[in-house]
From Swiss-Prot:
Belongs to the LysR transcriptional regulatory family. The keyword DNA-binding applies. Residues 23-42 bind DNA. Keywords: Activator, DNA-binding, Nodulation, Repressor, Transcription, Transcription regulation. This is Nodulation protein D 1. NodD regulates the expression of the nodABCFE genes which encode other nodulation proteins. NodD is also a negative regulator of its own expression. Binds flavonoids as inducers. One of its GO terms (molecular function) is DNA-binding transcription factor activity. Residues 6-63 form the HTH lysR-type domain. InterPro entries: LysR-type_TF, LysR_subst-bd, NodD_PBP2, Tscrpt_reg_HTH_LysR, WH-like_DNA-bd_sf, WH_DNA-bd_sf. PROSITE patterns: HTH_LYSR. The keyword Transcription regulation applies. Gene3D superfamilies: Periplasmic binding protein-like II (3.40.190.10), Winged helix-like DNA-binding domain superfamily/Winged helix DNA-binding domain (1.10.10.10).
Amino acid sequence: MRFKGLDLNLLVALDALMTERNLTAAARSINLSQPAMSAAVGRLRVYFEDELFTMNGRELVLTPRAKGLVSAVREALLHIQLSIISWEPFDPFQSDRRFRIILSDFLTLVFMEKVVKRRAREAPGVSFEFLPLADDYDELLRRGEVDFIILPDVFMPTGHPRAKLFEERLVCVGCGRNQELSQPLTFDRYMSMGHVAAKFGNSRRPSIEEWYLLEHGFKRRIEVVVQGFSMILPVLSNTNRIATVPLRLAQHFAEVLPLRIMDLPLPLPPFTEAVQWPALQNSDPASLWMRGILLQEASRLALPSAEH
């Protein structure tokens, strides 16, 4: 099929080449022979009047013209796939769909475990790929490279549909033997104690508690920075440091670690964990099914009370 002189099949080849950055891998990903893929490269170069790729060993290096085409080609193919080609009926029990989800380790531990267990009963062939919080999740959503992101709603990009999952609140945690926590925590002591904080992604994006504190004009004395929530609580062991974490995460670790959980001595509001998906997948039957599972499991969560 041609559109204004361009064989649309070549866009599939171009997308594979720009994704894989390797001729052999790109050919394999779309079930073409290597000679056929080489021929496609030649035709693409003629059409776009640009080399598009140069070789660096076995790696294909994109020219500036090719870099400018990456998003446009991916979005065009995604739109054709999701909006023009008819949806196939989705049978969870028969499906082998893999869902790619960006979320924090906190959510993996306290929420997705329940979703995974339910999947085993209702959709044994369905699988998940949980991805760490990235710096470019907005772009990944736009290109349809992930199925969902699950984040505090204050961090979510615009332009894609979303739904509320559950509310969470922040608490202070420390080692159970931390004598500084043997009495109610005052604001002055909270601010003066050494803190452990989490950052995410290559740009060291702050976690929700850091964002809230900065929004309210509070700056803690951070002694240790770790990648992800799950590394915070083990680092508190046998120290006088404290951390500010989601309550459900604190209670999850309190089952196996000697932790003390305390209310924060400052007025930070609860926050909302939400799920967001690509706009072009809004009517995808598989995405609709998965959204239903997420919302149903979230509705079963009650906001627990902090233990003192």
